[in-house]
Amino acid sequence: MELQLFGINHKTSNVSDRERFIINESNQFLLNTLIKDKYKNIIFSFFGLSTCNRSEIYILGKKGVIKSFFEEASKLFYLNEINISQFYFLQDEDAFIHMCKVAAGIDSQVLGEQEIFGQYKNAITLSKSIGVMDSNLQRYANKAIEVVRKVRTNTNIGVNPLSISGLSLKLIKNIFENPIDQKILVIGAGSLAQDVIKNLYNKGVRDIRAVNRSVKEIIISDSFGIVSSPLSTLHS
């Protein structure tokens, strides 16, 4: 058995392509069915991780199976529309090192950001709860958690606790003396955009407008009182 992975992230692809490949609970059920149908006794366990900036699938299986699994997963999720050069494939020690870097925030857009660690642990919890991660893969995942804790204890990597959304708020504060008096436009409807809006709202900013390609895709709590509109109205 060998730890292997394939993924796509902010370094290899643009936002629109990353949005095509989301690993949620239902998609993991589909992957599990695929494995049972075509990779029985070849792939033994897996888990998926999706954040604003990456989607990755980690597997424990026979050596060299990751490319074949990617091809089948591509058919399942229509990933053929994305150029294969935007994906990366890692195996064995390289896969584990990458897992540790991701969980520690070393591979993040904001070096050392802490949000990814929680997302990583949530992904593990979900995969365990739906029965797609076995004890062998869990050992790798738990070992990565140990590594992250040592890294954050023994280095300065965790000194900056900010996420992308936190940095956005910090930048606004640096530019405007009174951020709560400003009119803020947020472009996008993903989890990152929603985190930015929540942070702004919690800091007292009330005049917020959110635009996206489709207004139907903007899902924000009504309690925020956000004005939502499609991207076509940006200049209106």
Language-model features: locations:
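Glycine-rich adenosine-cofactor-binding loop
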Residues: 144, 160-213
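Conserved beta-strand segments of alpha/beta enzyme cores
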Residues: 45, 207, 225-227
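Short, charged/polar "capping" segments at the starts of alpha-helices
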Residues: 65, 215-220
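Short acidic low-complexity segments
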Residues: 222-236
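Glycine/serine-rich phosphate-binding loop and adjoining beta1-alpha1 elements at the start
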Residues: 82-180
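A glycine-rich (often HGG/GG-containing) alpha/beta subdomain
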Residues: 1-108
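Hydrophobic alpha-helical packing residues
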Residues: 35, 200-201, 221
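Short glycine-/acidic-enriched loop or helix-start segments at secondary-structure transitions
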Residues: 69, 196, 220
